[in-house]
Amino acid sequence: MAINLKEVKFAYNTPKKKIAPKFILNDINLHIDSQDEFITLIGQSGAGKSTLVQLLNGLLLTNYGEVVVFDKTLSNNKKIKLKDTRKRVGLVFQFPEAQLFDETVLKDVSFGPKNFGLDNPVELAREALSVVGIDESLYETNPFNLSGGQMRRVAIAGALAINPDILILDEPTVGLDPKGKEELMNVLVDLQNKTNKTIIMISHDMDIVARFAKRVIVMNKG
């Protein structure tokens, strides 16, 4: 079992004495395998979906309940090392501009492999960009000059370049036209068919959920 959550709660506020914390997540129990799962996470805005997926790669930490990712317990313990967890569980944010930062597409996607000390980071970046369908003619382009759909693909390539076991995407199709949605979902399906990686995707698009999800998790007020 790659990910195991047991009675997990999460609150953004730091409670003062005699003031109970306001929990965004309440008693979450969840088990996720590292291979061949295509999970969609659905629920109304504010249900805690984005908070939950950020717990899965250690971007957020909690002391309420137990979060175990690849046999490592993630908590607010300052001594815990999260680098390996974040390599194994890749996270792509809803808005790619929050993830992109470098002056060219190739440099941006190469950053992750370099940061994790992987061999041949530029080649890994090229392979990831090819997987998501970014043409080589765009490699030296500033990522912020790309279309919204292209930016999202580059952000996904940045996560894929470190070869995570699990890929998490927060609303990857939001803002895309029907053709763009179809193309992106085909990329993800093809990726899973070739690699057996588990993909976890937040979505409000019920058509996408019905067509592509192998497993659906519904959240309601945490």
Regions found by a protein language model. Give the residues of each.
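Catalytic Walker B motif of ABC-type/P-loop ATPase nucleotide-binding domains
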Residues: L167-D170
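H-loop/switch region of ABC-family ATPase nucleotide-binding domains
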Residues: S203-H204
